[in-house]
C-alpha cells in the first residue's frame, strides 16, 4: 500500500506546543536586556507623541506581593499598547524611600534609635537598607516582564529629588498655605509620631462605653429654664462616651442648639437632663424602669450653664455644637479639645485654652490626678471608671462596646487624637478647598465613581499635617525665632541654600549644618533649627514637581495618567492634587485609573491567618509570568480581583487556546515567504478574505478596548476569535485545502496568506499582555522583520471583504448559522453510533428560495465548508416527507443526513464514488490524484 503522507503539506514548526514558561521566560529576559530592548524602543519612538504614565512609587519594604504585581503589570500593559498605537511611552519606575516603616525595619536589625545608634549613623543605615530592598523588588518587577528604565529609576531619597522636595515645600510656603498650629492629630504611641489619615485604618475594637453625670452648679437658673423648683435637688447633665481616658481633659459639655432636652425624674430621687429623642433608649440602657418627664427646653437655653466635673475639682460650661448627633449616646457630648477635631473646633470658638496632659508615649503627665500620674491612657479606663463610681457619677458601663476605631496601619495598635504643635498646609487658605473641587472636574476618573470618592474626601479633609517627629525623612529646613517662634524673614532664600547643600550631600546635610552656617552670625543665636521631617506623602505627592521636570525623556511635559490602587484616593492622588493645585493651580494628571484589591475565591482579603495568600513569586515559579499577566488582564480590575488555584487553572486553559491558535498558524506557514508567496486580495479564496475581515473587526475592537483600559474585554474578544471564528470554523475548514492541494497552488498560498496576516495581527494584540509569548511567536513568523514586536505598531495589512467578493458578510453569517445546525445533527448521529465523524456523512439541505440561493452560491464546495463528504441543496418543498435526522432550528431549513456512500479516500479521508478510478492510485479519489500528479484542484470559496 502506498504511503501518501509525503504527498501532503503537513504542518511543521519549531514553536513548541508546551510553553514551559518558568524555564523559557528567564532566557527571554536575558535577551531583552542583552539587546537593550527598552532603549531600542525609546530610540525607535523618540519622535513620536509622548504619553507619560507617572509611576506612583511603591514603598520600599520587603518582597513584592500580588497587589504590587497587579499594579506594575497594568502599567506595563498600558505602556506597551500605547507604543503599538504610535506613542513614545517611556516608563521610569520609582520608589518611596523615607519614613517610619524603614525606621522600624532598621531598628529591628540594629537596635533602638537613640539607644543603640545615633541619628546620623541611623540615617546612613536606612539609606543602605533601602538600596538593598530596591534590588529585591526590582528583580521581582523585572521578572514580571515589565519594561522600563530599571537602571535609572527615580528614588525619593536621590539627593537631587530630596533637594527638589525642599524646593516644593518652599513654593507651598511662599504661596502662603503653610502654618504652624496646635491641633488634634492621629498619634501612635509606638511611632511616637503623628500619622497621616492615609496611615490610619479602622478596625473592630472593644471599648468601655459609659454614661456619666456632670453635677449642676446653678440650680436656680435650671429651675427657671424648666419652670420648676429644683433648688434643693441634685441635677445631672448626662454624657455618653467610649473614651473614659479623655475625661481628665474635659473642658466643656456640648448640646445641639436646636434639639429638645428633657428634665427627667428617676425614681423620685435623681434628676437628669438628656435629649428628648433618646430618653427611652437611655432609660433602657441604664435599666431605669420608672421615670417622669418634668420639663422640656431647647439646647440653646442651656448654653453657659455650669456643671461640676464628675471626679475633678473644677466646673465646666455648657456650649453649643452642631456636631452633636442623635444616633447614639444621650444627645450631650463631653468636650476634650486635645482629643477630637470637633472638640478642638468648639474650643477655638469659645476661646478655651488647649492644655496637653498626655505625653508622646501615651502616659498622663504629673499633677493631673493622683491616681493617673504616669498611667498609660488605655490602661486608665478602669481607674477612671472606679473614680466615677466613687463619686456617684457613673450611671452605666458596658465594658465590651464594639465599634470601629482608628489603628496605626504599621503597628496594628489603636491610636488617639492628640493635640500637638505641628506644621500644616491649610485647606481653606485662598479658597484652596474649592479650587481642588473645581480641579477634579477637569480630570477623567476611571472608573467614574472615583470622582465622587475624592470629592467627598476633599470636602471633609482637615488641614494637612505635614510634619513628623522622625529621623529618616526629608527635613522641614526652617529657622524659627527662639522667642516669637516666627519664621526667619528670608526663609525662602535660606531654603534654596539648604536645598543646594542637600543636592550635594543628601538630607544628612541639614543635620550637619549649624545655624551659623546658614544665617549671619549677628542673628544666628536668635534662631533655632526645626528638626521635624516631612510627611512621606509630601515626598511622593511632589514628584510631578520634583522628578518629572528633571527627566529629559519627559520633555517637561506633565503626566497623562496616574494608575494605582483605590486606596490612593486619600493617598498619592490626593497629596499630588493638593501640591499641584497649590503650586500651579492645575491637577498633576489628566486621567486617574484605579484598580481593586486582590481577594480569594470567596472574596476574602488575603491573610496568613486564613492561609489564602498567593504570592506572585509562587505563580511565576509554577506557571510563568505570562499566566500571572493573563490573570490580571482577564480580571475586571475595577472591582476586587479574585484569585485561587481554580481561577489560575482557567487562566491556563485560556492561555493554551491562544497559544495553540498561534502554533497552528505558524505550523502552516513554515514554508511561506510573505515577499514571494503572498496572494493579492482580489485573487484570494473567499473564505480567506472572510478570515482577514474578521481579524480586522477583532483588531478594531481590541484597540478600542485597550484605549478604554478594558483589558478583560480585550482577552475575551481574542479568546472568542481563537475559539469560535478560528478554532471552531476557519482553522478546521482550511485543513483539507492546506494539507491536500498542491504546495505552491493559489489555493494553498491564499490560505497561508490569511494565516500570515492573522498571526501578524494577533501577535500584536497579545503583546501588551502575553509579552513573553508574543516575543516567542514573533521570532517564528516568516519574513523580514524588526527584532522585537515591542518596537512595532498595530498591523496594517488587514482588509475588509471587498464588494467584488461573491459572498458578503451577511451571506457568511447565513452559512455559519446553517453550519451550526448541521453540526448539531452530525453530533447527534455520531452519538447514535451511525457515523464516526462529519466526513462519514452526506447531507441534503432543504431550504426556502432565499436561503437556498445563498447556499447554492457555494456550489460543489459546500461540503468543504460543512466538512462532510457531500452536501447538496434542494428546494424546501422536497423535504416534506423527510423525518430522519431532521432539525428545523432555522426557519426555512430542513436537514437530512445519511452515511456517505462510496469508499474512504486514504489521503483526504472523504468518502467518494471515484476511488480506484486510476490504476496506480487505487486507494485515493480522483481529486487527490489531480492534486498529486495533475494540475491540481481549483477552489473559489473554501
Curated annotation (Swiss-Prot):
EC number(s) from the headed UniProt entry: 6.1.1.5
Catalytic activity of the protein: tRNA(Ile) + L-isoleucine + ATP = L-isoleucyl-tRNA(Ile) + AMP + diphosphate
Keywords of the record: Aminoacyl-tRNA synthetase, ATP-binding, Cytoplasm, Ligase, Metal-binding, Nucleotide-binding, Protein biosynthesis, Zinc
Domain of life: Bacteria
UniProt cofactor(s): Zn(2+)
Motif 'KMSKS' region per record, residues: 605-609
Keyword Cytoplasm: yes
One MF term in the entry's GO annotations: aminoacyl-tRNA deacylase activity
Positions of L-isoleucyl-5'-AMP binding: 564
Broadest EC class assigned to this enzyme: ligase
Motif 'HIGH' region: positions: 58-68
Protein residues bound to ATP: 608
Cellular location(s): Cytoplasm
InterPro entries: aa-tRNA-synth_I_CS, aa-tRNA-synth_Ia, Anticodon_Ile_BEm, Ile-tRNA-ligase, Ile-tRNA-ligase_type1, Ile-tRNA_ligase, M/V/L/I-tRNA-synth_anticd-bd, Rossmann-like_a/b/a_fold
Comment on protein domains: IleRS has two distinct active sites: one for aminoacylation and one for editing. The misactivated valine is translocated from the active site to the editing site, which sterically excludes the correctly activated isoleucine. The single editing site contains two valyl binding pockets, one specific for each substrate (Val-AMP or Val-tRNA(Ile)).
PANTHER family: ISOLEUCINE--TRNA LIGASE, MITOCHONDRIAL, SOLEUCYL-TRNA SYNTHETASE
Subunit (UniProt): Monomer.
Functional description taken from the UniProt entry: Catalyzes the attachment of isoleucine to tRNA(Ile). As IleRS can inadvertently accommodate and process structurally similar amino acids such as valine, to avoid such errors it has two additional distinct tRNA(Ile)-dependent editing activities. One activity is designated as 'pretransfer' editing and involves the hydrolysis of activated Val-AMP. The other activity is designated 'posttransfer' editing and involves deacylation of mischarged Val-tRNA(Ile).
Record protein name field: Isoleucine--tRNA ligase
Protein's organism: Blochmanniella pennsylvanica (strain BPEN)
